[in-house]
Amino acid sequence: MSKYTSDSSNFGADGPFFRIIREGLEGLADGEDYFDLLADDVVVEYVISVPGYPRRVDGRQGVIDLYSGYDDYMTVHTADNLRVYRDPEASVAVLEYEVHGESVLTGRPYNNRFASIITVKDRKVTHWRDYLDPIAVFDASGWPKRSSLR
């Protein structure tokens, strides 16, 4: 088992999301799983997101709480197309990547693209600013229902 989650979860040591983030932050941050990469006082901002999702989460435990039920809604099978841009003087990395999976609730495919601006201090992520494609989330979740568009 990873430090904060099971190895097989989307965020665990064997999860494709963690593997691509670990690859993008190689040499900058260390951790046994996604949550272990985060500093205790990390700030995570969701600049482009979906309705009902928080715009900001403070602290590692807050991020763990936010994602505690994620595996019940979405399964990520693969993550790819990683592009990494770094400013070593500022300890900042910009990661562009894609995730592919399916909605657990609808069985619909989930294919999303992300851009994450990540600040690292003392080998832990201290700030994470995330941009995602909300339409991909809507498509996977079946929202809005087609009948409501008539």
Task: Locate the predicted segments by residue.
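Short, well-ordered alpha-helical segments
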Residues: 15, 61-64, 112
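A solvent-exposed, acidic/Ser-Thr-rich amphipathic alpha-helical stretch
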Residues: 32-91
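Short, low-complexity N-terminal intrinsically disordered segments enriched in polar/charged residues
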Residues: 1-40, 146-150
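Hydrophobic aliphatic residue packing
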Residues: 21, 42, 47, 63, ...
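A beta-strand edge to alpha-helix "cap/lid" segment located at domain peripheries
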Residues: 2-13, 69-150
